[in-house]
Each structure stands twice: as C-alpha cells, then as structure tokens.
C-alpha cells in the first residue's frame, strides 16, 4: 500500500484545513451541513469538552469562508459535501471568537474580554479588507469598544451586501470558571442586569435586526447551558440544537464511525 494512502491520526488537532492538507483521518461530518442550514440561522450546541466541537466549527468555517471559494476540492474533495454542495458554500466572511482566551480573574475580566474581541476583529479586518472600501481597517480601529466595532463591521458589510457568519467557541469558558472559582456574585455581575457579557449578546441580537443585515448566521458552542440561560433571555433569536435527535452525532463518534476507524487502523498495521 502506498505511504500517502495511510491516514495519520490527528490526536489533539482541531484545525480542519491542516488536518486535510496533512492527509489525516477525518470522521466526515459534512453531511450535517444541509441540516444545519435548514434548522435555523442562529444555533447553540452544548457538548462536553474533548468532543470535537472546535474541529466541527473549523470545518464549517472552511466551508463557508468566501476566501476559500477556489479551494473547495482541496479542502473537501474527499468529503460527502463535495458531491452535494449547498448554495451557501463560500458565501460568508467568517468572524470568530474563542472565549477560552478570556482571563476570568474578576479584576481583569472585562478588559480581557475587550482585548480578545479587538484582536479577533483586527484579524477579521486583515483577512477581508480587500472586500471593503479603502480605509476600512483604519475606520474600524477608530472605534473604541468591541460593540461599536461590531456595529461598524455589520453596517458597512450590510451596505456592501456582504454576509457574515459569526462563530463563537467555548462561549461559557470564563463564566464557568468565575462561577466555580470566584462565586455567584462575580458571575452575576457579568451575566445579569447590565453585565457586559449579557450586553454583548443583546448587541448581537440588535445586529441581526432590520432588513438586509450582514450578520446572517451564528454557530455558538459551549459545555453548559447555565450561562446560556442567563445571558440569552434578551437574545431570544437563538435555537438550541443540543438535544435535537437530528444532531445527536454532529460531534463525537458513533459506534459505526469508531468501528470503521479501527478497521482501517488494523489494515495499516
């Protein structure tokens, strides 16, 4: 058997594009893409850690990214979706946050949240600047908060008829740490009333209101529904697919998938 036909085991690897280019084994979940599109525009998925949530959203980002329009075969040629592409393939700019990077120490929390959001918004501007008018990045950075920068991106993209897919990984990482380490009072400061995290989700809802808004889709993952319940009472546009039978095998392995993996491994021993 030729060496390049043997798939590597991508232990700890959640970068879908690297996994594909390095010829690593991938349990194909791309047949869920049409179901995700049909389900709703703004989705929440709760699963335990180490279940493959990050790999899933990295796959979705690779599929929907407008910058990958010419790399479909390279990234998905071996997947189910290659023979069944949807109309939304490569139609979005991808805006991503991963809140595991936020410092949960109460004295640093809000500042760290702003820093993380700013970093991701700068990455977004660098990646898609060619789609906007000259001076877009400079105008974006003249705004002083994550909320005003999000609003500027959304309004500018809407005017240009561009589309945004927002992905948030580990949305509840720092809030779970606050609750378990610093207690309920500190947790409530961020997630209740005028708390900054609750306000962030209110802003997201606002950015989807109106006709022709660029922020068209969201996919948000986490490990617990606790924060979801606390910050999203005003964000009542999201659909929680966690317990939906349709998405039971969206992440993790089924018995059939695991058996197939083991059989291929035995063949190559």
Model-derived segments and their meaning:
Residues 213, 226-241:
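Short regulatory helix/loop adjacent to the ATP-binding pocket of P-loop NTPases
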Residues 152-157, 187-215:
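Substrate-engagement module of ASCE P-loop NTPases
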């Amino acid at each position: 058997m030729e060496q390049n036909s043997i798939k590597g085991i991508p232990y700890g690897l959640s970068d879908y594009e690297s996994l594909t280019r390095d010829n690593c084994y991938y349990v194909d979940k791309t047949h869920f893409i049409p179901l995700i599109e049909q389900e709703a525009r703004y989705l929440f998925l709760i699963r335990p850690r180490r279940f493959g949530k990050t790999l899933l959203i990295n796959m979705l980002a690779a599929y929907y990214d407008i910058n990958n329009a010419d790399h479909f075969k390279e990234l998905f040629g071996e997947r189910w979706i290659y023979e069944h592409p949807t109309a939304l393939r490569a139609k979005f700019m991808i805006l991503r946050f991963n809140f595991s990077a936020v410092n949960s120490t109460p004295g640093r929390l809000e500042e760290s949240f702003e820093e993380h959001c700013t970093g991701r918004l700068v990455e977004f501007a660098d990646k898609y600047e060619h789609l906007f008018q000259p001076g877009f990045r400079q105008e974006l950075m003249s705004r002083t908060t994550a909320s005003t920068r999000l609003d500027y991106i959304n309004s500018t993209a809407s005017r240009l008829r561009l589309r945004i897919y927002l992905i948030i990984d580990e949305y509840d990482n720092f809030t779970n740490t606050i609750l378990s380490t610093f207690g309920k009072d500190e947790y409530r400061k961020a997630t209740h009333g005028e708390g900054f995290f609750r306000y962030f989700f209110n802003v997201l809802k606002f950015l989807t209101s109106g006709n022709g808004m660029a922020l068209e889709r969201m996919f948000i993952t986490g490990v617990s529904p606790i924060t979801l319940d606390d910050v999203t009472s005003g964000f009542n546009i999201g659909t929680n697919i966690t317990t939906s039978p349709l998405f039971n095998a969206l992440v993790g392995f089924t018995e059939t998938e695991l058996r197939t993996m083991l059989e291929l491994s035995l063949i190559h021993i």
